[in-house]
Amino acid sequence: MMVTGFGVTLAVHTGGAFSLPWYLLTLGFAWSTHLMTHFCNEYFDLEADRANPSPTSWTGGSRTLVDGLLSPTVSLASAFVALFVGIALTAAMPTLSTRLLAVALMALAWFYTAPPLRLNYRALGEVTCATVLYGMGPLLAALLQPGGLSALLLWCTAVVCLLQVLRCLIMNFADMEGDRLVGKNTLAAALGPIRVARLYASGQGVLYAGVLALAAAGELPFLVAVAQLACAPAGLHVLRGLLNGAMAEPRKADGVTFWASMQLPLTTCGTMIALLVDLALRGTPAPTPWIVIAVGTTVVFAGWLTRTALVSRRPTTTAADGTRTRPAEPAPVEGQAERA
């Protein structure tokens, strides 16, 4: 919902209009493609997930197939069902450009782990995931709205795309040991821990310097820049964990991967609300239905984040066989299913 809402809000900020039917179609496409990717990754990443000695709450797959709770065949069949739903929704899109973009999005999502491309096994997964989820996703949502594309949409999409690349580096960092055992050559595995930390620090610095530069040039509304800069502490927390060796300790690694993941939806929701406030201050408020949907999405995310943060504070227990037991966790936020 947040990825779709991000693109729709940027389109509304540009054109002032909102189409509920096209939003619902885009949302259905996003959900079906997200489920397809999740089931596909579970199936084709099974060997790597089995080899992972220390999965976190946010990495190493859902463990559903590893623990035998679902058969691999069912996971693959579910991926195909979701794929067919996505194809049907693509056929209903109004223009050739939106249909081609949707097909390209589904193809990249499928071949993220599926052969023959297996992009996440060739150090291309981080960029692919960012391109699909926070690049093509918002662009498709915007193209299906009356407002269409704008320079602001491209700038904001570039910001969250870079954040997603950095997030995926951390996710794959956590899975590095198991990935290397099965020959899964993610970008994080290719770089190694020290260079991942350096790249993460450089990426965060470049990103927020870019936000400041865009705001100074008048390309980014002041409130949007403030909302995006307010999320920088999450990245600093992750970087501190990388430098302090937190990834070597399961509980601390959970915290690092959690905040690496949360920096994205925090930025997305903050940008959405800032754009709506910017419109209101200009005297051209967004359509009421979209304000209700956007604010509702943000409230749901805030509730989920609060609950998840509280759950993460509960102590884990270790069984006699060494198995760590975590507290029950809420359903994943958008993007968690792309765990490598």
Stretch-by-stretch model annotation:
Residues 2-7, 127-142, 188-193, 253-272, ...:
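Small-residue-rich segments of transmembrane alpha-helices in multi-pass membrane proteins
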Residues 5-44, 96-110, 150-170:
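Membrane-embedded alpha-helical segments that form the functional core of polytopic membrane enzymes
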Residues 11-18, 128-182, 194-198, 205-208:
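Functional transmembrane core segments of multi-pass inner-membrane proteins
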Residues 30-59, 165-188, 193:
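Acidic (Asp/Glu-rich) catalytic motifs at the cytosolic membrane interface
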Residues 37-42, 107-120, 168, 172, ...:
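C-terminal ends of transmembrane helices
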Residues 51-96, 185-228, 262-266:
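Multi-pass membrane catalytic core of lipid/isoprenoid biosynthesis enzymes
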Residues 62-148, 152:
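Intramembrane alpha-helical segments
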Residues 219-340:
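Extended hydrophobic alpha-helices typical of membrane-associated regions
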